Amino acid sequence: MAQDRKKVLVLGAGYAGLQTVTKLQKAISTEEAEITLINKNEYHYEATWLHEASAGTLNYEDVLYPVESVLKKDKVNFVQAEVTKIDRDAKKVETNQGIYDFDILVVALGFVSETFGIEGMKDHAFQIENVITARELSRHIEDKFANYAASKEKDDNDLSILVGGAGFTGVEFLGELTDRIPELCSKYGVDQNKVKITCVEAAPKMLPMFSEELVNHAVSYLEDRGVEFKIATPIVACNEKGFVVEVDGEKQQLNAGTSVWAAGVRGSKLMEESFEGVKRGRIVTKQDLTINGYDNIFVIGDCSAFIPAGEERPLPTTAQIAMQQGESVAKNIKRILNGESTEEFEYVDRGTVCSLGSHDGVGMVFDKPIAGKKAAFMKKVIDTRAVFKIGGIGLAFKKGKF
């Protein structure tokens, strides 16, 4: 019986990969399959909380927990390694710690920052990408305030922050900044009126997923707390001084001591090296989340471009979708092991909430708009539910937002 065991290999312990494994370990026995999870870090981090850790309103350690803390060690073999190559036909995955065979593969390698080729953006701007970048950014912001307070010759740029992008991540980061700035001003004796936060967005509208009414609420709330918006203003370069933007065909330099890029992500760069037809690290999947020509390879999360039947555009890359994909794949792997056909993935949109710091927010929940404290509360519910779905009540109690 043991020789008939299938080898299930899961790459990545983000929302999609970890949800797959935690559901699968409950659904199958050790006689049915050998599950191996490979992740480059020993920890999982809540990617949707990175804006808080980046602003310094949440300690970076509160964003992460050990991967093995949610695994059944008799069911899952965890390997801390970096994936370097996926060989679909040989059914092998190469890592910096060795080569692993598979019968069924789940690719959930997550995202990296996408700067769209903007000159200097990778070199001179902080990225909201992982817990390491979050820790670096929050420390840098505080260091700038400390330096301003200690310097005899004040540099106002120490108190100036540029944020590129007024999408979900950018706006949530701005909200956290408006919570953090008063604390820093109080700690270092800085006049808050001297702090300048500017958000630059190339598109004609911020938060394009929300109605004008919700967007106006977000803009008003953040502007009242000191944020200046430059909408329909493309960033053409980033340098050590800040952003270079284009206004009416002319280039302008915006100066700041801190530049942050929060305007784009893409799937893992390993995707282009491993598969054909990949765009920005994402591959179009079939309706059951496998890829063309390979019924034994699932691709989910940030690396997946899933187009629902009858639709033209793929679903966005969100934690909610990634976790639902993980559940679906776990069920389908169980079906494959039972000799049954796979089922199509059906996404259930339970709503989206964008936080504006810890006390306000905007969102759509079950097709109803919400804003203010109600939205802020709902965001905490969503964050806590995500932890509960993977780690149960114990992890939710330890890491949740209540």
Curated annotation (Swiss-Prot):
InterPro entries: FAD/NAD-bd_sf, FAD/NAD-binding_dom, NADH-Q_oxidoreductase. GO terms for biological process: aerobic electron transport chain. Signal peptide: none annotated. It is an enzyme of class 1 (oxidoreductase). The keyword Flavoprotein applies. Alternative, nonproton pumping NADH:quinone oxidoreductase that delivers electrons to the respiratory chain by oxidation of NADH and reduction of quinones, and contributes to the regeneration of NAD(+). This is Type II NADH:quinone oxidoreductase. It comes from Staphylococcus aureus (strain MSSA476).
